[in-house]
UniProtKB/Swiss-Prot annotation:
InterPro entries: ClpP (IPR001907), ClpP/crotonase-like_dom_sf (IPR029045), ClpP/TepA (IPR023562), ClpP_His_AS (IPR033135), ClpP_Ser_AS (IPR018215)
Active-site positions on this chain: 100, 125
EC number: 3.4.21.92
Subunit comment: Component of the chloroplastic Clp protease core complex.
Gene3D superfamilies hit by this protein: 2-enoyl-CoA Hydratase, Chain A, domain 1
Signal peptide: none
Catalytic activity, reaction form: Hydrolysis of proteins to small peptides in the presence of ATP and magnesium. alpha-casein is the usual test substrate. In the absence of ATP, only oligopeptides shorter than five residues are hydrolyzed (such as succinyl-Leu-Tyr-|-NHMec, and Leu-Tyr-Leu-|-Tyr-Trp, in which cleavage of the -Tyr-|-Leu- and -Tyr-|-Trp bonds also occurs)
Entry's family note: Belongs to the peptidase S14 family.
Protein role: Cleaves peptides in various proteins in a process that requires ATP hydrolysis. Has a chymotrypsin-like activity. Plays a major role in the degradation of misfolded proteins.
Name of the molecule in the record: ATP-dependent Clp protease proteolytic subunit
Listed GO MF terms: ATP-dependent peptidase activity; ATPase binding; serine-type endopeptidase activity
Keywords carried by this UniProt record: Chloroplast, Hydrolase, Plastid, Protease, Serine protease
GO BP terms in the entry: protein quality control for misfolded or incompletely synthesized proteins
Length: 201
């Protein structure tokens, strides 16, 4: 049986008494979570939170914790683009798995502020297709769109990892799983967490 969203006390600036509100206090602390497949719903939620928190205070960093098997490309690109658009730096933290679009969002964090937990796994690959569902004439259109998306993803990985195009293209040909230290060597994350340094204060 689900517990639901907890009520937490929140006092608005200028108010004397706190009121109990249905709000996730973690969001108030600017901590965001991607703990599922990337789809339109979670993408819209994260984008809305990033924009809202940026309007509320554009000087405090955002922290996006990722444990995701990946998912849809366009909603993932939406999250990535919003991370680049909002004024606060977005720290990305991989805890568990960042695969497919999860790793793409991970690499989209502010450079020098991308972190992976020691036992995290990161996986990159090329975008998938649904050719088996399409009619013959739709194959060509879908293939062209897929190539454009692959070029976009590849370009971003090249820019944000510092790796040459040929290495990124080769890695995206198949599923490439990496440990946290391998992802750091690959430029997907900047740091591997080893202990609590108190940075989240």
């Amino acid at each position: 049986m689900p517990i639901g969203v907890p009520k937490v006390p929140f006092r608005s600036p200028g108010e004397e008494d706190a009121v109990w509100v249905d709000v996730n206090r973690l969001h108030r602390e600017r901590l965001l979570f991607l703990g599922q497949e990337v789809d339109s719903e979670i993408s819209n939620q994260l984008v809305g939170l990033m924009v809202y928190l940026s309007i509320e205070d554009d000087t405090r960093d955002l922290y996006l914790f990722i444990n995701s098997p990946g998912g849809w490309v366009i909603p993932g690109l939406t999250i990535y683009d919003t991370m680049q658009f909002v004024p606060p730096d977005v720290h990305t933290i991989c805890m568990g798995l960042a695969a497919s679009m999860g790793s793409f969002i991970l690499v989209g964090g502010e450079i020098t502020k991308r972190l992976a937990f020691p036992h995290a796994r990161i996986m990159i690959h090329q975008p998938a297709s649904s050719f088996y569902e399409a009619q013959a004439g739709e194959f060509i259109l879908e293939a062209e769109e897929l190539l454009k998306l692959r070029e976009t993803l590849t370009r971003v990985y090249v820019q944000r990892t510092g790796n040459p195009l040929w290495i990124v293209s080769e890695d995206m040909e198949r599923d490439v799983f990496m440990s946290a230290t391998e992802a750091q060597a690959h430029g997907i994350v900047d740091l591997v967490a080893v202990e609590n340094t108190g940075d989240f204060a």
